[in-house]
Amino acid sequence: MSASPGCGRAAVALPWLGVLARVALLPVTACAGETDARGWLERMRNAATSGNYQGTMVFSAGGSMSSTRVWHYCVGDQTFERLEAQDGRHQRVFRHNEEVRTVWPQDRVAVVEKREPLAGWGTTPQQVEPSALENYELRAEGSARVAGRDAAVFLLEPRDGLRFAQRLWADRGTGLMLRADVLGPAPAGASRPVLETAAFSEIEIGVRPQPEAVLQAIRRIDAAAARLDAQETARSGSARAEPPGRSGPAASLRAPGRPEASSALRAEPAPADERAEVWHVVRPPQRRADLEAEGWTLRQQVPGFRLAGCVVRGIESAGQPVSVLQAVFSDGLTHVSLFVEPYRSDRHRSEMQAQFGAAHTVMRRLGEHWVTVIGDVPAATLKLFADALERRR
């Protein structure tokens, strides 16, 4: 399961989306050891990118469990998704291609984003990784049943110690992946531990696509954002006429589970209309970037990984707007995200390392910057990224 750009493990359904994206990235032309297994990869990729299905996904890791309701539709080359958390804080995500709207109904907060096509988000592959099966060996492991459906089982065995093995269950009728386990190293004489699991507990495949349900939600959120823009413009005009020392309405809000918002992130209060679902809209700024152009490079490449994309995101830290650089590296199956932000002694204290399920995190100071590396790989792999990163200017 890949680290989602800008989001933590609590982000709704992203672990499962990352699994589908990884399967979609797997090449079918590389030697997988079995012609039939290569054919299954083709089927899994097609089902993940062009199938219509809805169901409930359960994600378990680190002794905790969460579930998400998933609706996925494809119409031509257009992809539509709706995700709704079934546990904890109520959260909904609506996606049309790269346009993403995240809503916290109980807080009346919406985040409006256009997600860059970095690895690890969505179920549509952005490119094929021809070297993926240079890092993993694909093995067929028989049959099983998942969510009441017959499934073929496959193991992706890493060729080195820099990544984890993964076991996949694919629907025999359509090829859609029904379950994915990330497996830890096997202790001597014991079976491999399951670090985390994402699986459908129930699913309907081949449903009638309903893209309008997603588009209506996006239009409703965008209409609320447009109203807020108009009100902000009116307030700005009236504020110029006010005597010095008067202050207008607060223009910042911390969105639950998201970076703090500020005027730089365009978070504005909406009118107190009880019928409105959204009272606040946050637009985190984001732009594509080039790692070397931003002044960073890896002294040496981590074997099997290549740079898949790079963005700069705006967040608020301790009341101040901060730019965070994110670089995503892929080995064709899993991803590592590397974040760089300005170092602050009041926020960044000692170097640390953490684990939740298969996800490991390494954080450390590098000169005047703070580096965070996250991925579903062993901690030693993340340390290779952190050790190789250097400032060129």
Residue ranges and their predicted role:
Residues 1-13:
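N-terminal secretory signal peptides that target proteins for export/translocation
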Residues 15-29:
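Bacterial N-terminal signal peptides
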Residues 31-106, 134-145, 149-153, 157-185:
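N-terminal mature ectodomain segment of secretory-pathway/periplasmic proteins
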Residues 102-123:
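Acidic/charged, solvent-exposed loop-and-adjacent secondary-structure segments enriched in E/D, K/R, S/T
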Residues 107, 116, 157, 183-184, ...:
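A generic structural motif
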Residues 143-228, 355:
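Gly/Pro-enriched, hydrophobic low-complexity segments
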Residues 178-181, 368-376:
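Short, well-ordered beta-strand elements
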Residues 235, 239, 243-367, 377-380:
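Short, solvent-exposed recognition patches
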